[in-house]
Amino acid sequence: MKQCAWKMVLFLSAVTIAGLVAAVPGHSQDWASIKEASSNIQSVKAEFLQKRHLQILKDPLLSEGRFFYLASGSLRWEYLSPLRSVMLQKGDNIRLYHFSEGAWKEEMTQAVEARRMVLAEMSQWFRGRYEESKIFSHAYSPGPPGRILLTPKEGINRFILGIEIVLSDRPGVIDRVEITEPGDSATRIAFKNVEINVSFPSKLFDEP
């Protein structure tokens, strides 16, 4: 169960940052400019509200968090409430932690296959190479608002049916990411306080 949950965290973080990178161009946001602008991103930080709808639950599950990303290969994806957890990536090394009994505890879940796929995808997305994705096909709609549609290929569609990245009117920012999952489940992530190409301490990627 934990392994499935962490697989979802890995994919959510990768897709979310890919969306933020894609949103860099100005209001026209044509596909060529989206790809070209990806190379200009050095860092991203943002806060988010995640709302997950499950068929078995009447009310959605709400989570709040934040993330920090460096183009050099570092990522911190952190849930702040209702439960605290964090994924730290630095290069090829990924560590997963949850906060329990007043302390951070490292997860022993391997999720090797998911990690490998996500890292491979991220390396392509950050360069604007959406066409080279091995696990998603893509389509772009200029809108307004502009949208990037990602459709999973065979294998990944076991737990993700489709992803829609909705671009904001504000250049450099996306409005939300909507993820459709099997069993009439869905996840929606809305962003606020997005900052691009800002500085933050490298220790954010070393410890919870």
Predicted regions and their residues:
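Gly/Pro-enriched, hydrophobic low-complexity segments
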Residues: 130-208
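One face of beta-strands
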Residues: 42-50, 63-67, 73-77
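Flexible, processing/modification-adjacent segments and terminal tails
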Residues: 29-53, 58-60, 98-156
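N-terminal secretory signal peptides that target proteins for export/translocation
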Residues: 1-5
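Solvent-exposed coil/turn segments that connect beta secondary-structure elements
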Residues: 49-51, 72-74, 80-82, 92-94, ...
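An acidic-aromatic
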Residues: 66-118, 187
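Bacterial N-terminal signal peptides
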Residues: 9-20
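Boundary at the C-terminal end of the N-terminal hydrophobic targeting segment
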Residues: 21-28
